[in-house]
Amino acid sequence: MYCNNSNSFEKNDIPKTKEAQIAVLTPSEDKDFIVRKIVLKNGGFMPNHTNKIQHQQYVLKGTAKVVVGEEEFKAKEGDFIYIPAGVNHYYEACFDSDYEFLCMITTKDDEITML
């Protein structure tokens, strides 16, 4: 059994971003999935990039501009975002609030390509 508050995990700055932190919530013994909590402070961003693996995301708090492929969204609390493998995407917390979301991925090898 495993139950911990998501605010109690170690947060690390995400390289090549502005005002973005990540915390891995999944216990290390899980060999199938990884759940991460990502926080973009107001004015923060993650630049345009692709990943070899898909992402499934659930917005916990705030509002942000999210671009997936050619589509731009104003993502907000309660939204679910699916990002297929290999599709470019970026995030910008530009609506006067921090933006927090869960990002679920598999444990397959990933490769990030900055665009």
Describe each model-derived feature in a short phrase.
Residues E29, A85-E111:
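Ligand-binding loop in jelly-roll beta-barrel domains
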Residues R36-N51, A85:
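Conserved short histidine dyad/triad with adjacent acidic residue
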Residues V39-K41, N51-V66, M104:
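Short, conserved beta-strand element in jelly-roll/cupin
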Residues T63-K65, E72, N88, D98:
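Structural motif
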Residues E70-G86:
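Short acidic-glycine-tyrosine-enriched beta hairpin
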